């Protein structure tokens, strides 16, 4: 088995065996990683690479945010669940704007907020 397949199998096993609260942290970690890659794309000189890297990583982050939102238990989550749903919608809208206009500051803003949520979940 080559290294890529081993890493993929390891990740699948880690996700399948993780506690629900750890899955949330893993999703936040993925969003943080993708947003970091999108921010670094602003250093690319090739316009195609610049646009493709930003678009790809923002859409991956949006997919994570939508999954986090979908997983919320709004019936039992109370005010916290409602607040998270509002934040996730805000993040999704801001990232859509960042993707259309290629605005680094918006990506940095969302990255900062998601990092704060990740740190709170990890405590």
Where in this protein do the model-derived segments appear?
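N-terminal first-folded block
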Residues: 17-50
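Generic structural signal for well-ordered, non-transmembrane alpha-helical segments
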Residues: 29-32, 59-62, 66, 89, ...
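Alpha-helical segments in soluble extracytoplasmic regions
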Residues: 40-68
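Short, charged, amphipathic alpha-helical segments
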Residues: 52-55, 81-86, 107-112
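Short, solvent-exposed, charged loop/turn and helix-capping segments
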Residues: 64-81
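Amphipathic, charged alpha-helical scaffolds that flank and support histidine-based chemistry
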Residues: 95-111
